[in-house]
């Protein structure tokens, strides 16, 4: 009875009178994912894969479940995580189970990440412990108590996802799946997952599990329309793409030498082997083509450049081959029919002995491309802020960022940076456009500055923007600035990455945009 009322409160379909097909696409907060997320937090083994945002919801969760920190389900989860049961694996397992507290198997454990949990018996044992955890902690009551909060999250996401993404995918891949569910995961961060459960008729219930990107007014946020569209296309695509290449492991392995030059970039994104990297390349090639077809050439090219900047060196060749698929659908009615042609592209690349220049990823105008560059990392802090106390606190904040995520970086004052050769460096600059003297000198290289200056909202406002390195235009810089020095403190909580700039108030995104190159210079798109 509790489970029924909970799902009635939070499982809301995308409904449009003009497009009934959208009713197939659901958005929910799923008690199974919230349960496993809570256990992940209690293990303290999942690092930045779980959200550390100090919200009422997270405080409620810790208050409720910390007394169960020593439960066998938590201890066993910590062990499993250390052996590879992490990232998407727990999510795949959870969608194979019924809602808590019953957690009954709906699929064979062998199809639910058992191999990453030490085998089917090991996974069954942990699921039994998790069932006991859910009952003893009365997780269902906790979930029901927060149903209003979940409904607010769902409504917020619905307002930013007006399109029938399921139709986009079915049209492109040439096949239909049983169901499509967007799962909002407010306790997760830094990762999104595409998982699936096979029905008796071989069709799939597919899930796109979307992590929170920031918090606004105490409610987890999941990005704007552009971010949600990309994530849904990407995560749902795994359920179409992965089975195709998983069924031909020998053919995929033939081109395994291509992993060597991109090993570091792939491993840093939790794609440690060629099989996984191939699936990721294929998905990103398809989402790039979807952007070209549905959003236009500019959006498609920007998407392709973003994937290339993320280290997916072969995505352009694969996306180019997909044009042949699109133009010959009578010969290739489904993606399944065309998949061997994509494997052949990788075989061809492997035979070429590609030079080092092929793998260079020049600055493409996005924050993400600036931050994924190799080379020494430099953090530039201000010395000329008018608010001295805020300047001191900002330096402390940047030192904290350095200790947590940029441990090998060097911190420079703006004055030191102005006399250094930083042409080979990855740069993060902090402070106001006047108080950081390095930013003050080079602010005209930031195309987003005029947009920031024209914002009408009451401040303080934040701007995170990419810009070219003034000493080497093939490299990028990330500027973390604001209308007041104090507002730069905590700025990493504002979601940023896939676009050229983000303007926000606290952690709420107000405006984003991209750049284009014009006569060798970057300008607003």
Regions found by a protein language model. Give the residues of each.
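N-terminal signal peptide c-region/cleavage motif recognized by signal peptidases
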Residues: 14-18
């Amino acid at each position: 009875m509790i489970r029924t009322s909970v799902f009635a409160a939070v499982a809301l379909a995308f409904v449009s009178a003009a497009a009934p097909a959208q009713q197939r696409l659901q958005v929910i907060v799923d008690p199974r994912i919230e349960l496993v997320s809570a256990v992940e937090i209690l293990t303290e083994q999942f690092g930045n894969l779980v959200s550390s945002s100090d919200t009422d919801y997270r405080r409620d969760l810790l208050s409720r479940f910390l007394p169960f920190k020593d439960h066998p389900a938590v201890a066993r989860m910590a062990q499993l995580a250390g052996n590879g049961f992490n990232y998407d694996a727990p999510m795949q397992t959870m969608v194979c189970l019924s809602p808590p507290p019953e957690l009954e198997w709906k699929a064979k454990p062998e199809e639910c990440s058992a191999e990453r949990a030490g085998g089917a018996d090991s996974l069954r044992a942990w699921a039994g412990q998790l069932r006991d955890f859910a009952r003893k902690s009365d997780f269902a009551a906790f979930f029901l108590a927060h149903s209003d909060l979940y409904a607010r999250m769902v409504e917020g996401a619905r307002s930013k996802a007006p399109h029938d993404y399921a139709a986009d995918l079915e049209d492109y891949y040439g096949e239909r799946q049983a169901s499509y569910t967007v799962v909002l995961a407010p306790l997760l961060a830094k990762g999104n997952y595409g998982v699936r459960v096979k029905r008796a008729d071989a069709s799939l219930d597919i899930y796109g599990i979307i992590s929170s990107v920031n918090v606004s007014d105490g409610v987890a946020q999941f990005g704007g329309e552009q971010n949600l569209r990309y994530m849904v296309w990407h995560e749902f695509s795994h359920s179409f793409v992965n089975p195709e290449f998983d069924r031909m492991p020998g053919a995929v392995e033939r081109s395994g030498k291509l992993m060597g030059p991109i090993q570091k970039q792939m491993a840093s994104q939790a794609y440690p082997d060629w099989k996984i990297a191939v699936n990721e390349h294929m998905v990103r090639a398809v989402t790039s083509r979807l952007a070209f077809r549905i959003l236009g050439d500019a959006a498609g090219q920007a998407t392709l450049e973003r994937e290339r900047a993320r280290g997916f060196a072969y995505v352009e060749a694969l996306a180019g081959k997909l044009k042949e698929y699109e133009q010959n659908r009578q010969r290739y009615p489904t993606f399944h029919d065309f998949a061997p042609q994509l494997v052949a592209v990788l075989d061809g690349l492997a035979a070429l002995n590609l030079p080092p220049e092929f793998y260079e990823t020049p600055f493409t105008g996005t924050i993400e491309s600036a931050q994924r560059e190799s080379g020494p990392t430099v953090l530039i802090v201000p010395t000329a802020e008018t608010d001295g106390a805020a300047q001191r606190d900002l330096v402390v904040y940047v030192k904290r960022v350095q200790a947590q995520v940029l441990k090998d970086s060097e911190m420079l004052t703006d004055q030191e940076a102005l006399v250094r050769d930083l042409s080979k460096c990855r740069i993060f600059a902090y402070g106001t456009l006047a108080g950081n003297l390095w930013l003050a000198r080079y602010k005209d290289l930031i195309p987003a500055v005029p947009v920031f200056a024209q914002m009408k909202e009451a401040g303080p406002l934040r701007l995170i923007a990419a810009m070219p390195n003034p000493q080497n235009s093939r490299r990028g810089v990330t500027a973390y600035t604001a209308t007041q020095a104090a507002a730069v403190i905590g700025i990493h909580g504002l979601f940023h990455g896939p676009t050229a700039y983000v303007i926000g108030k606290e952690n709420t995104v107000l405006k984003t945009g991209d750049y284009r190159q014009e006569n060798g210079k970057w300008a607003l798109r």
